[in-house]
Amino acid sequence: SSAASDVYKRQDLARAQGIIKGYKTLVDWEKAGVNRVEAVIELNVSPKKSRGFDEIAATIAAFDEVESVLLMSGGYDLQLVIKGQTFQEIALFVAKRLSPLDDVLSTATHFVLRTYKKEGRLYQDEEIDERECTVL
């Protein structure tokens, strides 16, 4: 239909202009039976005088393990989301690759134990208790 072709044209234009950065499939790795560990890492860094946080953020973003890098306000400078297959793999990444970077002053690693909602999608199937409750 004409309306559908207009939507595709708008999507193509938005991709060409860099407005749409990409598409992503959200996978429930637990349901898929795949070992996948996620961690949120808080970093305090020493920014460069001429480039601020951009240089160290770009260096960190280049690591394959890094899913996201965010400049934060508050108690720390950068927030990272890291993915790996085991807790040890992430711990080794922090110890061997992240912490040794000259501009990294400190790290605090928080392992994700369970995901309930991510990017607007619920991950847990709600169990509904359909028994009636009588209050006496």
Task: List each model region and its residues.
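N-terminal low-complexity segments that are often proline-rich with Ser/Thr-Pro
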Residues: S1-S2
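A compositional/biophysical signature of low hydrophobicity enriched in polar/charged and small residues
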Residues: S5-L136
